[in-house]
Amino acid sequence: MVKMTRSKTFQAYLPSCHRTYSCIHCRAHLANHDELISKSFQGSQGRAYLFNSVVNVGCGPAEERVLLTGLHAVADIYCENCKTTLGWKYEHAFESSQKYKEGKYIIELAHMIKDNGWD
């Protein structure tokens, strides 16, 4: 008999002295403001931000999608804590002008809030 155990996910916490973005649903930290690349993106549910790196985020399988800027291979990303879909990760850009997005993350504003040090 094989005993199945569920692996525990350890949550990353960003330094409290930095401005951060958190999941609006469970308040898990998602990104440091210093990792923000652009506020000029569109997600499937409205405005979105492009980040260089994120934490506490899982990644689904990549698939090809035609987005506003052309064909990309993207993978949906979700909060590791509450499993809410947050946006996507750019795995591959087919047009040379879009290559800068590869390996970067889109998080929709509808799923995140500002945390720590925004006063």
Swiss-Prot record:
GO terms for cellular component: nucleolus. Residues 19-116 form the Yippee domain. InterPro entries: Yippee, Yippee/Mis18/Cereblon, Yippee_fam. Keywords: Metal-binding, Nucleus, Zinc. Pfam families: Yippee-Mis18. Zn(2+) binds at C23, C26, C79, C82. The keyword ATP-binding does not apply. It comes from the Eukaryota. One of its GO terms (molecular function) is metal ion binding. It is found in: Nucleus, Nucleolus. Widely expressed. Detected in fetal and adult kidney, heart, liver, lung and skeletal muscle. Belongs to the yippee family. May interact with FAM168B. This is Protein yippee-like 2. The gene is YPEL2.
